[in-house]
C-alpha cells in the first residue's frame, strides 16, 4: 500500500501520513489547523522492504486503515540544561579520577 507523507511547516519533525496524495478528508480539522499547510515529502510503500526511520510500517498502515491517517510527532528533545548538567558532572568525575591517580 502506498501512502503519501507530508511534513508540517509549523512544527519541525512532525509528519502526516495519508492513504492518497492530497487526500485529507479523514484528518480532523483541529489537527489540520495545528499541522498547518502540509508540505508533500514523498510516496512510500508501507508493504515494501524499506523501513520507516521513526515509525513501524505496520503501525502506520494500521492507523491509516482504521482512522485514515497517521501522525508522527517530533522526537522528544532533552532539555539543554539537563544535558549541560550531565556533561558537567561527567567532567567533574573525570577530574576527580585524574587527581586520585596523581
Curated annotation (Swiss-Prot):
Stored PROSITE patterns: YCGL (PS51648)
Cysteine-cysteine disulfides: none
Domain YcgL: residue ranges: 1-85
Pfam assignment, any one: YcgL
Cross-referenced PANTHER family: PROTEIN YCGL
The name this protein goes by in its record: YcgL domain-containing protein MS1047
Native source organism of the sequence: Mannheimia succiniciproducens (strain KCTC 0769BP / MBEL55E)
Upper classification of the organism: Bacteria, Pseudomonadati, Pseudomonadota, Gammaproteobacteria, Pasteurellales
Amino acid at each position: 500500500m502506498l501512502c503519501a507523507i507530508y511534513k508540517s511547516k509549523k512544527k519541525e519533525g512532525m509528519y502526516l501520513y495519508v492513504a492518497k496524495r492530497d487526500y485529507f478528508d479523514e484528518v480532523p480539522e483541529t489537527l489540520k489547523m495545528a499541522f498547518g499547510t502540509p508540505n508533500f515529502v514523498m510516496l512510500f510503500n508501507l508493504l515494501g522492504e524499506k523501513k520507516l526511520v521513526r515509525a513501524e510500517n505496520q503501525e502506520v498502515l494500521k492507523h491509516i486503515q482504521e482512522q485514515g491517517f497517521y501522525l508522527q510527532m517530533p522526537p522528544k528533545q532533552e532539555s539543554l540544561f539537563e544535558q549541560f548538567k550531565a556533561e558537567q558532572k561527567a567532567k567533574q568525575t573525570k577530574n576527580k579520577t585524574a587527581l586520585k591517580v596523581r
